Amino acid sequence: MGKFQVISHPLIQHKLSILRREDTSTKDFRELVNEIAMLMGYEVSRDLPLEEVEIQTPITKTVQKQLSGKKLAIVPILRAGIGMVDGFLSLVPAAKVGHIGMYRDEETLEPVEYLVKLPEDIDQRQIFVVDPMLATGGSAILAVDSLKKRGAANIKFVCLVAAPEGVKKLQDAHPDIDIYTASLDEKLNENGYIVPGLGDAGDRLFGTK
């Protein structure tokens, strides 16, 4: 069973509380998503493997540690997931970036996939699927389905806020993946939005309705 973890770092929680505010501007919202993603990227990458290498400092030769060549991929669920990409890339700039595009049918609340663009060697990579919200779980499940169909096996899902309903659905559908969030919120409302949540992350990121 994959693990579920709420990352409760004080800086993350402080920034998340500002992110949730109705009066937070588009500019500030975008910057906060980026900052929280970077802080979460630090936490979720703790188990990346290291190897020892010999290097030359200005003083002497020494054996130090570096990432052991593990290939990484960041896969945002469009469109809101785009807001989290740069935060991760600031930590691992050599990572490849894939894209999975979805929109939510407003009547059925089910996700509809319209784009899958991934690195050719996605099956060899440690994948971080990023989306600010894990609400009903439908988009996350469909994204992981798409990745697994292409041979991906090492997948982590990273979000800013999650509803219990979405967490359970994702765990039931894909019990092998790890799920990380900055907050496990109360519930979903009748419209499928997280309560208290932060509104529509895509609209708030891009200033649209």
Curated annotation (Swiss-Prot):
Biological process (GO) annotations held by this record are: UMP salvage; uracil salvage
Binding-site residues for 5-phospho-alpha-D-ribose 1-diphosphate, renumbered to this chain: R79, R104, D131, P132, M133, L134, A135, T136, G137, G138, S139, D200
Question: What reaction is this protein's catalytic activity?
Answer: UMP + diphosphate = 5-phospho-alpha-D-ribose 1-diphosphate + uracil
Does the record bear Membrane in its keywords? no
Q: Per the record, a Pfam family?
A: UPRTase
Query: According to its UniProt record, in which pathway does this protein act?
Result: Pyrimidine metabolism; UMP biosynthesis via salvage pathway; UMP from uracil: step 1/1
Q: Which family does it belong to?
A: Belongs to the UPRTase family.
Task of the protein: Catalyzes the conversion of uracil and 5-phospho-alpha-D-ribose 1-diphosphate (PRPP) to UMP and diphosphate.
Q: What is this protein called?
A: Uracil phosphoribosyltransferase
Native source organism of the sequence: Streptococcus salivarius
- Tell me the organism's taxonomic lineage: Bacteria, Bacillati, Bacillota, Bacilli, Lactobacillales
UniProt gene name:
upp
